[in-house]
Amino acid sequence: MDSSPVSARFDIFEIYRRFCAIRSGQQLCNKKPCDGEESQRFNLSKEAITQLLYLVENKFQARNSIFDELFKLMSRLDLMVDFTEFTCFYDFVFFMCRENGQKNITISRAITAWKLVLAGRFRLLNRWCDFIEKNQRHNISEDTWQQVLAFSRCVHENLEGYDSEGAWPVLIDDFVEHMYSILGPNKDTSLFCKCGDTESESCLYQEDEHHKDYRRPHTGLRNIPGLKRKTSKKNDEEEEDEDEEVLETQNSSSLLNFKRIKTSNSPRCSSKSPCSIERSLSQGFASLLSTGDKP
């Protein structure tokens, strides 16, 4: 190993700094059509990554020490707050796990890396790693590596938030099928309110501890590119149907509390729930009041 002063200064922090700078240039080129100059810049970025990988392989001849270095770097970065920083670090881990110029990384190295960087972030991490260890026969590509991060952000323990029509790698689709076979028909329905009372609507939502600027359904669903928001579309259609029913009721009587009727017509409302009984009583009173107005 080269023990020169230059090599000694080329530690994990410097490697990470250079990697992030190169990736920033690549992402900038990817966001807009590349002209001749931009295309040349992109090619230079690819060459820079190749050269950086060569330096890494010379610096860390004992490849097992890479995870010690990554852990040291991870403890110094503010990854819990800045997700952009974490995404760059996550890609950097894949880069550091590459060997002999290969574009993919080995299964054992990928599993070790996932357990390092996704601990506390991926609810199905242990099941995922067990599945990969037992079923995967090929090395992990960079695209699959990045898709696993997206999957970890949008899918809950009960697989709510997973879109079977999404552009997931086959490996992730196979994992989901495997999880369905384990979970069976029993779904956790306790996450959804069955009373239909709008004042109790808060039971349908939970605040995300790291993203408190919005409220989201407690399904683990994130607003990320490529994820089809089927649930939101379905809810919008249900709300339109409810609004039409409210307007019809308004034409028959102006004495009703339309908000409560709309609530009781919610698909989440049980036929024997308090709001369902209240709706029947309200309709009965409306009929009586309407009859009483006649001369």
UniProtKB/Swiss-Prot annotation:
Phenotype caused by lack of the gene: Root growth resistance to the anti-auxin p-chlorophenoxyisobutyric acid (PCIB), which inhibits auxin action by interfering the upstream auxin-signaling events. Also resistant to the auxin analog 2,4-dichlorophenoxyacetic acid (2,4-D) herbicide.
Domain DCUN1: 1-180
Start-end of Acidic residues biased regions: 237-247
Pfam families, alphabetized: Cullin_binding (PF03556)
Predominant subcellular localization, coarse grouping: nucleus
Protein keywords: Auxin signaling pathway, Nucleus, Ubl conjugation pathway
Keyword Transport applies: no
InterPro entries hit by this protein: DCN-prot (IPR014764), DCN1-like_PONY (IPR042460), PONY_dom (IPR005176)
The keyword Nucleus is assigned to this record: yes
Protein name (database record): Defective in cullin neddylation protein AAR3
Organism of derivation: Arabidopsis thaliana (Mouse-ear cress)
Name of the gene encoding the protein in the UniProt record: AAR3
